[in-house]
Amino acid sequence: KKKEFTKSFAFRMKADSETKLTKNTGFYERTSKLTRNFVDARGYWLPNDYTKHGVINEYTACREKAVVIDLSSLRKFEILGPDAEELMNYTLTRNVKKLSVGQVVYSSMCYENGSMFDDGTLLKMSDHGFRWVCGDEYAGEWLKEQAKKKNYKVLIKNSTDQINNISLQGPNSRKILEKFIFTPPTQPSISELEWFRFTICRVKELSGIPLMISRTGYTGELGYEIWCHPSDAPKVWDEVMEAGKDEGLIPAGFGALDLLRIEAGLILFGNEFDGQVDPFEAGVGFTVPLKTKTDNFIGKENLIKRKENPQKKLVGLELISK
């Protein structure tokens, strides 16, 4: 009789937090049939590469055709309430007040001393609703602390376990989505979706699986992220793979993603920044609009000083021969 044994790591998001065990994402039912090489990504098992392809082939497919990557370990927080915009404008370096509903912005998140401890994307879901997508669960607790200090009227909810997401990246990604995505007249179609915008849509028809698709990514290629409920994840994976079978689509893991994001100059916590450097030193000074954001935000005073006296500089090296 065949027996199956699972493997988990116990970890804490903070020193005083309860331990949590590594979990599977909604896409595991499909990805586990294609690879046994999984890595622990902040509490979730995600593929490092796939048996039939390997890191180099997956990297090449993203640059030339298309890949799909499970990124469900990203933390998602819903920020709701009359003071939601005030909170996010105060806690992020970006000017959140410039966002319109349906827009996405990449931002740094800093301590009072100007050091950057997380980054992510902020989606404006409604007039009083935002979704913060980032790398670390601590960001949610930190947002709650800041809201309490300022007496903001907001609800902050961790929605990570209710929202899974895959990243569809590569030159053929738009063509793949257009084959099976239905968008209502009130939402932008896939062909109309602009960079750093999102659309609310469904699979194939009005009664199909509900999705959100954002034109975002972590590879430097044309790309999108597909957001769904974990219970719908296997069917969504099937639809993506079926639509991409004639477009050179293959699954890719974290190994290829690391190569892609380094080439694109995209930073990762624990590598290019670590809670000690500021956004200017980490190469994302564009996320700190000191001249145009007149409102106060956490770290502003020290970021003004640190911009004038950087201690480090992140640079990219292009290798022209072996």
Locate the predicted segments by residue.
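Conserved, structured C-terminal
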Residues: 1-50, 123-322
